[in-house]
Design a protein with these regions (language model features):
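Metal-dependent catalytic cores of enzymes that make or break cyclic nucleotides
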Residues: 1-184
Length: 184
């Protein structure tokens, strides 16, 4: 969770798309990013922790974590009072959308995807690639960079992708203190 905050923060501080964001807005978006996967609490553990590839049916269930997350946040009255509420709902719902419309849950394209969700999208993919999971070892930083830039993980906003390439070397520092990192 901390890495998503840090990666998002680094994007917000370095992307020309976010140059007019106030320090307060950058902090609110970074805090909201932490809740990107809150909807996974609605996904059965057998699917979340499955050591192998998900079946098409399981993947359809997994995809619901986006809408489930936004709905969960909207149902908590205290959340509505927080300054990052709208960002959190947008990020939870749209962080799996892709620039070319091949994401989910709505298949949005381009700037129809909220900017903060676009940023968390690439941050989440990078974190998932370079971190070990129950179903895979961590990829090397170099391999993760090549996969993202090469389009293996979907199509991202070209300006966000350019920022990612500029800051990727510094993103590695976020993981340098983790003793769990075992890169393949």
């Amino acid at each position: 969770v901390r890495s998503i905050y840090d990666i998002t923060r680094m994007f917000l501080e370095n992307s020309p798309l976010c140059s007019e964001f106030s320090a307060e807005k950058r902090e609110h978006v970074s805090l909201a990013a932490i809740m990107h996967d809150v909807g996974k609490i609605s996904i059965p553990d057998a699917i979340l922790n499955k050591p192998g590839r998900l079946t098409p049916e399981e993947f359809e269930i997994m995809k619901t974590h986006t809408t489930q997350g936004a709905q969960l946040l909207e149902r908590i009255p205290q959340m509505r009072e927080l300054p990052f509420f709208t960002y959190a709902c947008d990020i939870a719902k749209f962080h799996h959308e892709r620039w070319d419309g091949r994401g989910y849950p709505e298949g949005r394209t381009g700037d129809d995807i909220p900017l903060w969700a676009q940023i968390v999208s690439i941050a989440d993919v990078y974190d998932a690639l370079v971190s070990p999971r129950c179903y895979k070892k961590a990829f090397s930083f170099e391999k993760a960079l090549a996969m993202i830039v090469g389009g293996e993980c979907g199509v991202f906003n070209p300006e966000i992708l350019a920022c990612f390439q500029d800051i990727e070397g510094r993103l590695r520092n976020i993981y340098s203190s983790s003793s769990e990192q075992v890169h393949e």
